[in-house]
Amino acid sequence: MIWTLRAAAAATLIATSSLATPAAAQTVCEEHMIRVANAYEIPLGVLYAVGLTETGRRNSLQPYALNIEGRVFFGDSKDQALAEFNAARAAGKKLIDIGCMQINHHYHRNQFPSLDAMFEPGQNVEYSARFLKQLKDRHTSWTMAVARYHAGPNNDPAQKRYVCAVIKNMVASGFGQWTPNARSFCGEKPAA
């Protein structure tokens, strides 16, 4: 499965490293994308499509989004998101993804100086880029880095769904196009 995953989507994920601004209106999350993509040598289309897959709504990334053990929350402000986070923690919830790039608090909180820092769009996007780069270095391809960003090593079905969602977002945002292998892998029908 892993080799199939690599082969099927690799061309789409690495084919587009353009640093043009995405078509969507920029938000506070997007403002940091070009800088961190350059700093960590990540194709901008990959980073942006991961963000769209995580918190894309109304054509932009959402800085105060949470995923609380499967329940999505879009806050209007950092204070509102922090209040929702604190209520979830008080209710015993542990797996909470935070911010623009949905960094999991349980697994990654020690990489930030504070909870507040996890909600800061610049720090959230930068950590995401650093983490993606580490995954790419470990797994040798952007496709596998993207797959592991969202799901652990023993969850091939979730990895496949996530990679296909990221490819769809790359194509939709103008950062890539479907290759025959990616279409076949994701079950995407050819354009009419």
For the regions a language model picked out, list residue spans one by one.
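Hydrophobic helical h-region of N-terminal Sec-dependent signal peptides
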Residues: 9-15
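Catalytic glycan-binding domains that act on GlcNAc-containing polysaccharides
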Residues: 25-192
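N-terminal signal peptide c-region/cleavage motif recognized by signal peptidases
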Residues: 15-22
